[in-house]
């Protein structure tokens, strides 16, 4: 299905709006449109990038007044002749126009099929095609900036540059194989090592950016933890500015992890309100605490809450569970309004989740943990899990090649390791190694039908 030349059609806008857009693409796109469109001139005679007013007609009956935008190959999104029909947003009108188009020779597009055609026509590389879905799904300024940069090319040029350098190294090594009987060394081993180390550093820098990129794309996970009844759910409600979570004086009320998303200055944070941590014989509460520990493990930021009364009673200030080295920790002392004279231990933040004291300061601190400056200064940031896995595999292959270089690995085996690096780096964009149909289907199944 991916490589056929059918003319395809699909709605490009969500249902429910005042207006709708229907997209059609393929060799017969304009001829098919002419069978149902009545305007001043045939669309087949129209130039690209022109808009035409007319009517959609069904067996002589006017269905709707529309505008049709014409795109000519190869200067269209898909690289094919294409048109976009702008009509009124009635679901009946949209479904009728699609029925007329399919009856006239088009077929309904599958998920992401327009973008598949753009990729196969060389209009986009794979990473740019994936960014189309990301930009549609973006829910914050930072996530939009990340997806928009990738859609404009992102690190595609840098990766292709790496592939070219690696191909040069491989060519020199394989030239040695052609002259193996003469024992000629075309690739100076010291220079080869230096070049491979530079490439490895570039790959590692891209890999290391994934933590930030994925957090921006998916939302920064923040686990709200602490003993029962310290005000965790009240804090989440205060951050949301609504009574989203049930609050009770009864210890152990929260038994499941509750997730809510909050946009703080252009970055989405995923707050995980967790069950209070304590020793208990209650089986359901124990299960909730186990889920709390799982939430802590996957969080980028951990908020550990206590309160003034517990501090006065000698409760520990620091959490008693382990944290990863890359996790940020915030210790909050809640209910400071009930004990204004209670001294705050060093490194803690005093708040009152009930009346809002210290909440804006908490928001600023959370936002400061996410450095998005790189997004707006052209730094390459990886946010796609497939790209991260490909770069990890490339880095592993390059390290094997470096180890082999140091141990005197045979030239043909060394060349093969470098070719593995090229394969994995090239799989990110798909330009240096054409992706399989299974990979394409997996990637484009995440796109909406009209894209």
Model-derived features: positions:
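Conserved G/P- and acidic residue-centered "switch" motifs that form tight phosphate/ATP-binding loops
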Residues: 122, 229, 273
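C-terminal-of-GTPase-core extension/linker across diverse P-loop GTPases
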Residues: 2-11, 141-263, 280-282, 309-451
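Short, acidic/hydrophobic/Gly-rich beta-strand patch recurrent on exposed beta strands
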Residues: 23, 236, 273
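Conserved nucleotide-binding/hydrolysis micro-motifs of P-loop NTPases
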Residues: 16, 27-29, 72-76, 90-92, ...
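Inter-motif core of Ras-like GTPase G domains
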Residues: 285-309
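Switch I (G2) and immediately adjacent beta-strands of P-loop GTPase domains
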Residues: 52-72, 252-280, 298-301
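Generic enzyme active-site microenvironment
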Residues: 271, 305, 332
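A glycine-rich (often HGG/GG-containing) alpha/beta subdomain
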Residues: 1-145, 149, 153, 325, ...
